Design a protein with these regions (language model features):
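N-terminal alpha-helical modules
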Residues: 2, 8-103
């Protein structure tokens, strides 16, 4: 099997660039002029967990004992099997949408 070294270097560079941009956006979301609604925060949470932890690896919490934890679990579970690069891109897109909505 042959690999094109230039293609591999380009992919690594793009991945590093995406990771760096994602990390910047995780900080940027903390500096928004107002707190996003719960629905948007949960969506961002799901993407974030998928990037750093992969597929949801915990059992479903009982909503009766903790609705907040159950909603967070559902948000993460809803992006199960999503590629981490796609999750990073969706996170970045969502933060950009939030920024635009505050203008």
């Amino acid at each position: 099997m042959f690999y094109n070294l230039n293609t591999m270097i380009c992919v690594v560079h793009m991945t590093e660039e995406l990771s760096n941009t994602f990390r910047k956006y995780t900080q940027l979301v903390k500096m928004l002029p107002k707190k996003p609604c719960d629905e948007d925060l949960l969506l961002l949470y799901g993407y974030y967990k998928q990037v750093y932890n992969g597929n949801c690896n915990i059992g479903e919490p009982n909503a009766f004992f903790g609705i907040k934890e159950h909603r967070k679990w559902r948000a993460w579970k809803s992006v199960e099997n999503m590629d981490s690069s796609l999750a990073m891109n969706k996170y970045i897109q969502k933060v950009n949408q939030l920024i635009e909505s505050y203008k």
